[in-house]
Amino acid sequence: NGEKYLVESIESVLNQTYKNFELLIIDDFSNDQSVKIIKSFNDKRIQIIQNPKNLGQSITMNIGLQLARGTYIARLDQDDLCQKERLKKQLEFLLKYDYSIVGSWVIKINKNSKIIGYYHHPTNNEEIVNAMGINSALAHSSVMMRKKDILSIGGYSEKYKIVMDWDLWIRAIKHGFKIGNIAEYLISARMHNEQ
């Protein structure tokens, strides 16, 4: 049920400077106009999957991991926004460095897309590993991941309704995968009372 912010979010992906991507949108049995909004976009890069019932975030993200055709997976929540060079910069990072997951710093916005703050995550693998005992150290909506690495550790644990991202990061670290954050604001994460 993300109709309120969905157009802005989809447009932020379609307007990327890097154009060679598939936009896989999974509707988790919404009861608003989300599907109609998604179908209104005339862009062959968009593929919509509709769950037959509400399956929850972890299962839905695993469906996305299985169905995505790309080598790299960038995720975004329906109410968040990508900056124009997000995909380009994260792809360049993963092509240059032996990392499995890369996030970024975050612009915090309100329900009207006005900036209300900034979040600086640790950037290098060692700092992120050390921070994981305190907090996630990555904004889930900001990550791009190597699909094969994430699948090799079983994807998202379906036993969690929340913190499934934190669990994934911890398991990635335990398997020796490196995690980084680009020290740039590549996403805007929306803070509102409908979350």
Where are these regions (language model features)?
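Short aromatic/hydrophobic "clamp" motif used to bind/position activated sugar donors
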Residues: I73
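Conserved nucleotide-sugar donor-binding catalytic segment
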Residues: Q66, Y118, P122-Q195
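Conserved donor NDP-sugar-binding/catalytic core segment of glycosyltransferases
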Residues: E85-I116
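Acidic helix N-cap motif at the loop->helix transition within catalytic regions
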Residues: K4-V7, D32-S40, L81, E85
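Glycine-rich, basic loop-to-helix element that forms the pyrophosphate-binding segment
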Residues: N51-A68, K89
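Short, acidic, metal-binding catalytic loop of nucleotide-sugar glycosyltransferases
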Residues: E11-N20
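The conserved acidic donor/metal-binding loop of glycosyltransferases
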Residues: D77-L81, W105
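A conserved acidic beta->alpha catalytic loop
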Residues: D27-K36, K53, D77
